[in-house]
A protein has these predicted regions:
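Catalytic cores and adjacent flexible loops of soluble metabolic enzymes
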Residues: 2-260
Length: 260
């Protein structure tokens, strides 16, 4: 990957005139904060140090999405982000000068995040299926904010209907396949390049670097990369397919080289 990045820089300087690329790098924390504000603060701080543009959390009510008989119920419940916790996470991120935003899964969460002054929202793949309670109401609340929206449709869904809901928002659709981990060979690069966002579930950092290089050659102006990030000792369900802080730092370094 390093050699590929360096080769691209040399090739651009000799033969190509490509526009500068701006890549918005999102560190998806997901469940890797494990219900611990101390771990969340450490993740936020380290993601900032690694060069990420934003940290993203998931704001849902456990009882809306899971049965209390779920084998991971205790962990799920512990990882629920309440209004009080969301406010604390936003303050931590503000103090570290890194953007904080969420995938919000119910309308009241959107209303509260508006009070906190978040700049954008994420729509998760499962929300695009309209099967969770109040999915449509949640999407409509996000649309009413007029703020930028990031959308993953890794489980499918009606893109036309979703685009209609967000007709007045700046929208970035992400290429995404909801498999954990996703085998690199399953990426359809021809299809991926139809998107300006890449929500990656492969192991390591190769896939998002390849996406960035290919979008650069497409002369894209702005793209988005989302990657799950963990601490070394993370044990939650997102941990096996998440990258470490060191890997995030390496990923961002490659992306910033490619952007120029």
């Amino acid at each position: 990957v390093y050699i590929a990045s360096e080769y691209l820089i040399k090739l651009k300087s000799v033969t190509l005139k490509l526009c500068a690329l701006k890549t918005f790098v999102v560190a998806e924390i997901g469940s890797n904060w494990e219900g611990s504000l101390k771990k969340a603060e450490k993740l936020i701080r380290k993601c900032k140090d690694a060069g990420a543009d934003a940290v993203k959390f998931q704001m849902w009510r456990a009882t809306d999405l899971y049965s209390n008989t779920h084998p991971s119920w205790n962990f799920i419940k512990k990882s629920e982000i309440t209004f009080n916790i969301a406010a604390k996470l936003k303050k931590i991120a503000d103090n570290e000068s890194i953007e904080f935003f969420c995938s919000a899964f119910y309308p009241e969460a959107v209303d509260f995040l508006e009070k906190l002054g978040v700049k954008r929202y994420k729509v998760a793949s499962r929300t695009c299926l309209f099967k969770d309670p109040q999915s449509i109401e949640t999407l409509e609340n996000k649309a009413k904010t007029g703020k930028p929206i990031i959308i993953s449709m890794g489980m499918g869904g009606n893109r036309d209907q979703i685009q209609k809901i967000f007709s007045n928002n700046k929208v970035v659709f992400c290429y995404c396949i909801s498999e954990y981990p996703l085998a690199y060979e399953k990426i359809n690069w021809n299809k991926a390049l139809q998107y300006n966002g890449f929500s990656d579930h492969t192991l390591g950092i190769t896939a998002p670097i390849v996406f960035t290089v290919l979008k650069k050659f497409q002369d894209a102006k702005e793209i988005l990369i989302e990657k799950h990030v963990k601490l070394k000792n993370s044990k939650g369900p997102d941990a096996p397919t998440s990258i470490t802080i060191n890997q995030l730092s390496e990923l961002v370094s490659h992306i910033r080289l490619i952007e120029k």
